[in-house]
Amino acid sequence: MKKVKYLLFISMLILITNIPVSADNKEILKNKEALGNITFGVIIGGNNPEEEFMQIKDLGFSHCQLVVSEYSPELAKRLRESIVKYKVHPTTLICMGPGNYAWNFTQGPATIGLVPREFREARIKRLHEGIDFCKEVGIPAVHAHFGFIPENPKDSLYVEFIKIMKEIGKYALNRGIDVYFETGQETPITLLRAITDIGTGNLFINCDVANLVMYGKSNSLDGLKILSKYVKSIHAKDGKYPTNPYELGKEVPIPQGDVNFPAIVAYLKQIKFKGNITIEYELAEKNYEYIVKTKKYLEKLFLSTD
């Protein structure tokens, strides 16, 4: 009798495990897997890590990008301790400055990043310090706006920029650190060319899909497609195309702008993107209600079967 019951149990188990999965269920499982490949983060100031890490942990975030004013051994120690305590992991250190940055089309080319000659020496020093700080804390990458990279590869500013970035890339590579370009000032194909020409193997992209729109360099989806080979992280931000020839397009809350987030997420699922999406809203730095709402919106897009 026991043997008969056992055989019946085995037969039912075989039947259950061989029930075909419907197309809808397959799509649901596929979307859950896609969402599982994504980590969500926010941008925080790293000068007071105990408080900042606790706040974003309470909001349900496990990752962040850091902005730090001074790179000191004491702060590095506090950051390491906070990472362990709160299990919040910095994905990049945003390393900018020193000097003025003009976020427009008139003064921007002469003030942003390493393309302008005037600020190079001090900013290279700052990047070296940022890379060393990443190594000390355990942050895998440093990232920055590197400037309005010239379209013409024969332009002397382009040639100088490539030489500088090769040195920075090698400096970071020797310390096990990656360097991320923030999209914005250059066309996607120019950025792709620059990374190829630099060629140190540790250069990647933090793709700010709104910047592609706000600088008028590309629509968000096409820009992402061109750069996807090197995209390790994404800034979830929205904006409008520029209409004033001297000023960037306006930033707006997601999904009120010209970034096509349903198409962006569909493409990320298509290419099986694995990486971080950092929610950024520069109009309200600590608008946690907006950040949580946006995270839910993006998660819903990942789980959508449409």
At which residue positions do the language-model features occur?
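Hydrophobic faces of well-ordered beta-strands that scaffold small-molecule active sites
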Residues: I38-I44, C64-L66, P90-C95, V142-A144, ...
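Active-site acidic/histidine proton-transfer and metal-coordination neighborhood
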Residues: N104-F204
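Bacterial N-terminal signal peptides
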Residues: L8-T17
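Bacterial N-terminal signal peptides that target proteins for export
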Residues: M1-L8
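N-terminal pre-domain/capping segments
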Residues: S22-E129, K135, L173, T200, ...
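Acidic-and-aromatic substrate-binding clefts and catalytic sites of carbohydrate-active enzymes
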Residues: I43-E51, L66-R78, I149-P153, G184-T190, ...
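Acidic/histidine-rich catalytic cores of soluble enzymes
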Residues: H63, I162-D258
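Conserved, mostly hydrophobic/aromatic
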Residues: I56, C64, I83, C134, ...
